[in-house]
C-alpha cells in the first residue's frame, strides 16, 4: 500500500485518522501507529502519514516518532508532543508547528504504572531482556505492543536527531539499530554522546505484531531519550542503564 499524503487533499485526513484507529483495533493500552519502518526503508518514501495536531494527546499518552521528510524526531511525554528539529544543533525540543506531520509515530496511553527497580548496571541487551522478563511477570504478553519508560542515569548513551539531508545510507533505515551501534557521523543526522546523562527513555515495545512497523526491522524496541527537564530529545542508538533506575511498565 502506498503512503497517503495530506499535503494536497485535506479531505484525506479523515481517511488517515480512520485507518489509524483501524490499525489500533485490538491492541492494548490504546496503541495507535502511523507509517511503517520496513516499508519506508524499502520505498524511500518519507512523506507525512498523519498531522501531529490529529494525534491523541490525552494525559497519560506516551509516544515516539519522526517528522515527515525525516527532518526531526518526535517524543510524547504525558500527552505533550515535542519535536526535535534537525536544524537545532543541540537537539532541543519545541512544540509542533500547526502543519507539521509525522512519517512514523506510535503511542500508547497508560493510567497506571508498575515501578520496577533496576538491580544492577545493564547494557542494552541485558536491559531489554529484563524488560521482557518483568513484563511477562506482570502478565503482559510479549506478542503484543506496549509503551514503557525508564527513569534514571545512563552510563553510556548515544542518540541522534535526523536532519532531512541526503547522505549515504539516509532514510529512516538510518534510524540505526540502537543495540548494534550502526550510527556514525553522517550528514543526515546529528549525533549526541552523553555518557552519564540522567533523564528518561520513552519506549515502544513492538511485540511480534508490530515488529518492523513501529520498530527497526529485526528489533522490538524503539526508544527515545529525554533529559530530566525535557529540553532535549532524540532517537536512542546505544545505551546502558545504571543500577537504581526505575523501569515503568503499564498496568492499565
Which sequence ranges carry the predicted segments?
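N-terminal low-complexity or amphipathic/hydrophobic leaders
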Residues: 39-103
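Long, positively charged binding patches that form subdomain-scale interaction surfaces
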Residues: 124-201
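Functional cores of ribonucleases/endoribonucleases
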Residues: 186-217, 226
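C-terminal structured interaction module
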Residues: 224-252
Amino acid at each position: 500500500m502506498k503512503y497517503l499524503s495530506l499535503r494536497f487533499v485535506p479531505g484525506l485526513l479523515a481517511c488517515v485518522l480512520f485507518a489509524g484507529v483501524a490499525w489500533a483495533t485490538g491492541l492494548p493500552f490504546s496503541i495507535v501507529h502511523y507509517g511503517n519502518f520496513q516499508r519506508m526503508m524499502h520505498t524511500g518514501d518519507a512523506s507525512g502519514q498523519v498531522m501531529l495536531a490529529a494525534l491523541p494527546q490525552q494525559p497519560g499518552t506516551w509516544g515516539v516518532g519522526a517528522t515527515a521528510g525525516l527532518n526531526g524526531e518526535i517524543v510524547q511525554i504525558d500527552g505533550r508532543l515535542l519535536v526535535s528539529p534537525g536544524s537545532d544543533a543541540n537537539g532541543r525540543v519545541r512544540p509542533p508547528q500547526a502543519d507539521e506531520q509525522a512519517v512514523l509515530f506510535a503511542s500508547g496511553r497508560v493510567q497506571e504504572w508498575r515501578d520496577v527497580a533496576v538491580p544492577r548496571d545493564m547494557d542494552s541487551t541485558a536491559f531489554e531482556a529484563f524488560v521482557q522478563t518483568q513484563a511477562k511477570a506482570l502478565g503482559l504478553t510479549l506478542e503484543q505492543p506496549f509503551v514503557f519508560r525508564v527513569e534514571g542515569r545512563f552510563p553510556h548513551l548515544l542518540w541522534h536527531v535526523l536532519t532531512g539531508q541526503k547522505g549515504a545510507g539516509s532514510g529512516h533505515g538510518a534510524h540505526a539499530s540502537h543495540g548494534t551501534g550502526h550510527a556514525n557521523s553522517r550528514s543526515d543526522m546529528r549525533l549526541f554522546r552523553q555518557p552519564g546523562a540522567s533523564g528518561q527513555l520513552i519506549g515502544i515495545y513492538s511485540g511480534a505484531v508490530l515488529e518492523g512497523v513501529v520498530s527497526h526491522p529485526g528489533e522490538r524496541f524503539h526508544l527515545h531519550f529525554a533529559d530530566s527537564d525535557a529540553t532535549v530529545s532524540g532517537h536512542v542508538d546505544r545505551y546502558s542503564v545504571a543500577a537504581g533506575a526505575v523501569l515503568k511498565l503499564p498496568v492499565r
